[in-house]
Amino acid sequence: MASPGTPAVISYGHLLTGAVGEFLQAESMPGPEIARAVAELVVNLSRYREERVPLSPVVFITDDRSHLLTRIGGREIVPIGTGPQDPATIRKALKLCAPLASAEWFIFVEQVAETFHFGLFRGDDFVLSPTPIEVLRSIVNPSVHMVAVAQLAESVLELRGSQGNSRYVYLSGARTEMPPPLVLEKLVSAATQDVLPPSREDVRTIFRHAFLEMLHMSHGALVAVLPPTGQSGSHFVDGLLLDIPIDVADLIRHYHEVPNEDARAAVQAVAHLLQGMLAADGITVLRSDGRIAGYNAFVHHLPGPTLENSNHQIGGARQRTFAALSARVGQTLVAAFFYSQDGYADCRWVGDSAKP
């Protein structure tokens, strides 16, 4: 016990390590060393930077690197280094590998006896191909021992295992009742609800990739979804609204009909274009038939709540804009989406009222 006048120490480290250990136990990867190492990985990835540049690599931990190729779609492996099974090796692996782990490259850490072997492996960066962690989310295989750690947003992480277990880890004060990936699925559904099969799933894949990248933006984002017959200009007081909305489904259909490099490049490029629009200030405007209608848009705010004895509205500018958009959902909008700087996400969708 601390002596009188000596501050007691409060640390979340042992709580995090304990929770990670329980997750790994459920994944048949028990042991205090691996629990401490993965907890170190979670803490480091939550706000990882090199030379003040934020990085968000996805890290896979396994006891057999061949599973990276045979189970989750990896293409080739590049070994980088080794070290004892301790947090220092995890920090070293991130230092050496994180700057290289972008686009199609991912970090792996392999348990071999008493050591960690680490390096990089390559996936397929084509936007219609599932990423390794998307494949991992879809499998439940007791014979495979593999977990992934991914930063979804600053201080918000996902733990995902090959035996079907998952956790969302919040190291911030963000509200946790609806994790961002679940909110994004509502937005994906809203933006594709009027896309006809068989293109719908591919359009959903493109939008999902772009929206997940959006979570790494430090400034937040806003999205409005119009119905197929919606007139963009009547909703917004300013913004860059396209005369001819970009038909993502049409680009995908053309790629499947003529799967050449030009068609593939067009699909890849429209995904990058959407990511750029989401990174811009203002509202990104989509249509529920899978079309991109505009970006950098703004709306008049409807009258909202004010602080007592003040004329100032509650919440920041994006939150007030989201309130204005939400008031139009079910009338002139199909959905409205809001993502804040602290990792909180919300989506209002007409499809919510159709659920039992």
Locate the predicted segments by residue:
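Divalent-cation
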Residues: 1-356
